[in-house]
Amino acid sequence: MILIAHRGCSYPGYNQNTLRSFEKVINEGVSAIEFDVQLDADGNLPIVHNLDLTMVSTGTGQVSSSSSDYLKSIHAGDPERGEDRIPFLEEVLELFASINEGKRPVLHMELKGNGTGVPSGKMVREYLDEGRLSTVDILVSSFNWDELKAIRTICPELDVALLDGAIRRGPLMARVPGGEVYFSELFAYGEEDYMLPRYPELSKNVTLLESLCPKGEVFDGLKEEIERCLSGGYYTQELLDEAEKMNAVSVNLWFQTVSEAFVEEAHKRGLKVLLYTINSKDELLAAAKMGVDGIFTDFYTESKEVLGLD
């Protein structure tokens, strides 16, 4: 099993998705680092998690409508944790390419924003063709599986992973018309295309829903979707079928909702299972006992010690 440094790290004094956070865990010997790729208004590829800048930078507005110059003028994360810039994909690829092959962590590139697949593929293609990076250095993941197909049109040899476990905004809006007015308060990342219940416990989510939405069809539809998500209802044979069809190497799933039985089924299909994002001792040990192949964590050194990894 491997640990993947989620957005670099969340150590005190470090901001996620920054070159400094990547360098920190690289120096600690991490074997893989995950980061998020978006597309800005100028067609460049900033490394930012949230679609809206407000919670993850000193800026405001959508990443997709922001210029590269604006993104370069603001700080990533909280300046009190360090005055970090928002990096761009080329800078990250340069950082990894500068590391000796034997010590180079695998880049887990999550294609976060719409339209990221082709431009990311073109940039990665240059590094592959120049021999500065190789296919074993890169794993591309996304909740938007069309972006995985898109990057494969440029780099067909890249390994891909299907992300799942989140509530998909578009399908939920279609199933529960009118429910979208509650998304921002009901879900984590409620303004985005892929959302998570606020709490791992169904009862807490139902209590929150009751405080927001009157009983009726909308209430029932939202409650049903939360129940489906938390019960692992998204982890189906169809998901594994799609992973096989796309020749994916893994499915990356929300640890709160995955079962040991599904992990075993994925393994029977020849697929690895990676879980996001685990930081507590008990949950790390439970995931390891389940037999998963990798865990995304915000605290690499602490998680490594808990699991007794070399």
Give names to the regions the model predicted:
Residues M1-D310:
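Phosphate-group recognition and catalysis centered on beta-loop-alpha active-site segments
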